[in-house]
Amino acid sequence: MKKIDIIGENYFGKWDRTRTSCRGIIINDNNILLSYETLTDTWMIPGGGLEENETEKDCCIREISEETGIIVETSDCLLEIDEYYENYKFINKYFFCKPIEKTEIKLTENERRVGMTSRWLSVTKAIDIFSKYDFYKNNDEEKRGMYLRELTSLAELL
């Protein structure tokens, strides 16, 4: 498994907080399933935080199910991208996923508030969206970093 570090411009030089997330890449006929926040106009690869006593694969399966309503099978972890912002280290584990069946979407209160939905986009369109990460350099470091992370994951895995 390859590991890549992304250092944010606002990184303090050391971290004392860590969050691990697991993300699933689902491809079908050269389209990729992405999560989309309608309120913030933000795209991302589906996934979320690892819970206590949960395996990374189980986290990926749960998060994709909750956000997209699709139950998946996962590969082993193929890529880890560690991001450093302020005093945080964000560990992102990426998996390839295969859809198995549909289930009920179970969004968190925050995901409902930002209007999260899932949408299929061409891989080319997704890469185009994420490649504009530098547009957010001076006004939204979180979004800039997220788009750089997602672009990096697609460049490494596709």
Name each region found by the language model.
Residues 46-48, 107, 131-133:
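Short acidic, glycine/proline-rich loop/turn micro-motifs
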Residues 41, 111-158:
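Nudix hydrolase/Nudix homology domain
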Residues 27-66:
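Conserved Nudix-box catalytic region and its N-terminal flanking loop in Nudix hydrolases
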